Amino acid sequence: MIWLKNLRVPILLAIILVVYNEYFIFFIAFSSCQWPCKYGRCSESSVKAFMISDTHLLGKINGHWLDKLKREWQMYQSFWISTWIHSPDVTFFLGDLMDEGKWAGRPVFEAYAERFKKLFGDNEKVITLAGNHDLGFHYAIMPETLEMFKKEFRRGLIDEMKIKKHRFVLINSMAMHGDGCRLCHEAELILEKIKSRNPKNRPIVLQHFPLYRKSDAECDQVDEQHEIDLKEMYREQWDTLSKESSLQIIDSLNPKAVFGGHTHKMCKKKWNKTGNSEYFYEYTVNSFSWRNGDVPAMLLVVIDGDNVLVSSCRLPSEILQIMVYIFGGIGIVILAFILISRRVRIFKRRPSYSLLMYRSQEKCD
């Protein structure tokens, strides 16, 4: 108990360090993000949406339990704290929800889906898309995996929905290979049906793969922290959709904005429509997980009439968190050592002082 009293301050500081690093850094990060509303205030008819991609919940093959615990805690904190601060109308998860869904049998897939729902919720405000890690790339997709995803996440090849009268079209990127297979043929028929209706209001297109581009050299900066990778070249149908499929989506849907993920890098690209003055922006969202980069991100999107307003929101840096733990931990250990050393010196002095007092009293007698 004596030693514990001396360590009260270091123990209190250790608790504060953990609380700060596991809670307050998320509040600080998300408090600095803002909805990009016109004139600083969003109208009641506007839709406020989070765009999140590539959560990659780890599985048994590639995921160590400690890595899994750390990443899922980071994403859980990020999602719920940002939701509490900003209150979005809807959150879109743009694919690769799971890391090993493509290899999972039914029991494992169901357990995967249950973990995702526990982390991010299971209600009408959480809308998911499939990615290649959920189903596999085009030639690796099994009908059973496709059905399991449809059952667990209520998502077809192409879905159309309305939120506050704003249209959204959700596309399974792996069904846009364009090779005439049953999957692609079914997706193309749905696109043609949407095109034939020719609705007046242009939709927001959501998918996992970005539209075709050779590299991120074609991108504009999304924010000040965005460093554009000029070296990596993208492969059609692996890193992006093919050029033909991209043009088919643009021609069929005439989108007012496109959002995707997959590359684990941010991108903002302007697309000009041939034959008229219309254009739209495509946004690629960074991964939401620390496992795929030091500073994950999401997008805060406001759809207000024909305007699609976008701002990026960076999550806390994992390296910064680690450095705070290291230097804070070293400081606490040094403080504890000083307090213990001081206690030991005081404890050693007491016997000699008592003995001296005792002998002095004997001489006086």
UniProtKB/Swiss-Prot annotation:
It comes from the Eukaryota. Its EC number is 3.1.-.-. Metallophosphoesterase required for transport of GPI-anchor proteins from the endoplasmic reticulum to the Golgi. Acts in lipid remodeling steps of GPI-anchor maturation by mediating the removal of a side-chain ethanolamine-phosphate (EtNP) from the second Man (Man2) of the GPI intermediate, an essential step for efficient transport of GPI-anchor proteins. The keyword Repressor does not apply. Binds 2 manganese ions per subunit. The keyword Protease does not apply. SUPFAM superfamilies: Metallo-dependent phosphatases (SSF56300). InterPro entries: Calcineurin-like_PHP_ApaH, Metallo-depent_PP-like, PGAP5/Cdc1/Ted1. Pfam families: Metallophos. Keywords: ER-Golgi transport, Golgi apparatus, GPI-anchor biosynthesis, Hydrolase, Manganese, Membrane, Metal-binding, Transmembrane, Transmembrane helix, Transport. GO terms for biological process: GPI anchor biosynthetic process; vesicle-mediated transport. It is found in: Endoplasmic reticulum-Golgi intermediate compartment membrane; Golgi apparatus, cis-Golgi network membrane. It is a multi-pass membrane protein. The chain crosses the membrane at residues 10-30, 319-339. It is an enzyme of class 3 (hydrolase). The gene is mppe-1. One of its GO terms (cellular component) is Golgi apparatus. Disulfide bonds: none annotated. Its cofactor is Mn(2+). Belongs to the metallophosphoesterase superfamily. MPPE1 family. Its main location: endoplasmic reticulum. A divalent metal cation 1 binds at D96, N132, H208, H262. PANTHER family: METALLO PHOSPHOESTERASE RELATED, METALLOPHOSPHOESTERASE 1. This is Metallophosphoesterase 1 homolog. GO terms for molecular function: hydrolase activity; metal ion binding. A divalent metal cation 2 binds at D54, D96, H264.
